[in-house]
Amino acid sequence: MAETEIIFSVQESPEGGYEARALGYSIFTQADTMEELKLNVREAVRCHFDEGKAPPVIRLHMVKDEVISA
């Protein structure tokens, strides 16, 4: 049975822009803006899977680390 969605962990890049890594798949992409990242993620998923085999839903999980003093 085919997967119904693929999840990407998205973080702000230390160099600027954003980085996205798929959970459970060897898919990584990056971009300067969030809109560009969405396009790059779609393209990376299309390139990774055979035609018609890609999950129909892509979920972007935004992760932001914040350090606070105790």
Per-segment meaning from a language model:
Residues 20-21, 27, 61:
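Preference for short coil/turn "hinge" residues that link or interrupt alpha-helices
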